[in-house]
Amino acid sequence: MKRSMYAGRVREEHIGTTITLKGWVSRRRDLGGLIFIDLRDREGVMQLVINPEEVSSDVMATAERLRSEYVIEVEGFVEARQQANDKLATGMVELKVSALTILNTAKTTPFEIKDDVEVSDDTRLRYRYLDLRRPEMLENFKLRAKVTHSIRNYLDDLEFIDVETPMLTKSTPEGARDYLVPSRVSQGHFYALPQSPQITKQLLMNAGFDRYYQIVKCFRDEDLRGDRQPEFTQVDLETSFLSEQEIQDIVEGMIAKVMKETKEIDVTLPFPRMSYDVAMNSYGSDKPDTRFEMLLQDLTVTVKGNDFKVFSEAPAVKAIVVKGNADRYSRKDIDKLTEFAKQFGAKGLAWVKVTDGQLAGPVAKFLTAIETELSSQLKLAENDLVLFVADTLEVANNTLGALRNRIAKDLDMIDQSQFNFLWVVDWPMFEWSEEEGRYMSAHHPFTLPTPESAHELEGDLAKVRAIAYDIVLNGYELGGGSLRINQKEMQERMFKALGFTADEANDQFGFLLEAMDYGFPPHGGLAIGLDRFVMLLAGKDNIREVIAFPKNNKASDPMTQAPSLVSENQLEELSLQIESHD
């Protein structure tokens, strides 16, 4: 029989009609001789009623065999329910079954197919096809489909060209580790799976495509966390002849369209802009969450000359004030915050509380001489908690930024209904890597430096600024972009500043440098993390919830057991040999 409609779409207007439905048995109940079935499909749940006085003995026998997750086909008459169920979209109607066929049986599932099920993440991933049956998960992927549909329509209307770029590319330095693919034909040589289509999309601008986009898979072999996966999807854009502001205008319009069409939210344009330095100094993060206050306060000048040497001799002293919540934090709680702070390089955490109008706590006695000035600068009031970090400016900012976010979550200070978009601009071109012992690109080595700072490529790299911009949403980096280098001489200077010899630069990026000899236009673009964007729109805290078949925190798939061993024959074909490190 042909399915008439989705079970979850049956409504009052269908009363009096005979329809055919197909789906899964969500639940079976026997009540007073009647059998009630909750039939589930991707659109929802519909109640079926099987009355032994109105169906054949064969139908009744089939109904008695039904168990959860059996796949069935039913035909019946739509009636009004005697008792409506306002928890279901189909709650005003039910289907009086006249015919029933079992299309497939099912074993007892390892967990219930319902929202809010308590089961380990690895079990969910091991049986991902069952996990995806849960209504909550289905809704996540309907949302994702709406987002990509909206993005494609918007960019198509602006005459962007959707171009696929290679999945087998050249391994290049900078950035995260590559996933490598050995070549059978060119033995000893390897492809890399792309971390982004960065260079190829720039070459498309050189080809005259003018406006490119792609919703593309990317790969990075890096440590995982809640908002990262080894393979992920990004909305990739590149344009020719546009300014930084023009590119941002396009992106803002795209996001506004997505928010309107998927969440029915009108976002205010243009988005606020904040410099990198302000973000770090006031929020302790280059991706600040602006849904709450608790800004970092610089006390370095205030405490200079103080008898408390931990403060007076530190390069920087900064603090955050937890307003009106000191009584929520016992000494044990603050000890936990101190251990948390040490993860970010802080040696410790000093603190005081405002109690009966006075500063109280382990360091209060050292602050007596500046108590009035301190209270005025921090605008202290009764029951405030002040947390201090005395260290380098970088450690103080990073530590207090992390504490700020943690405390806001602990105290439920964040309005989860808000979507605060923000541009972070005026980035440093380079960041110092302790691990590498050198400066590395803050974004990538193709970013255009500002005209005012480009001369420092041969001088103090810490002073070079980039024409780069990140878009931030609720404390997450949603995407990043920049204007790109299009002059060969500037690109060679950039490679040299990063420590490449001329031969190394030519070996790794010779094809790009050669392309710059053939009229490379000014260009720039941006990439947005699609998984992260959908995660935030869905109100989730892990991108696994919006990726159909994700990896776990060990970058493995419990369902398929990937990555897996391969045969000796396969290794021999590739001239590979695995060394044991036991």
UniProtKB/Swiss-Prot annotation:
HAMAP family recorded: Asp_tRNA_synth_type1 (MF_00044)
Naturally occurring in which organism (per UniProt): Streptococcus pyogenes serotype M1
Region (Aspartate): 198-201
Identification of the protein by name: Aspartate--tRNA ligase
Any one GO CC term of the record: cytoplasm
GO biological process: aspartyl-tRNA aminoacylation
Enzyme Commission (EC) number: 6.1.1.12
Chain positions recorded as L-aspartate binding sites: 174, 220, 443, 484
Binding site for ATP: 220-222, 229, 477, 529-532
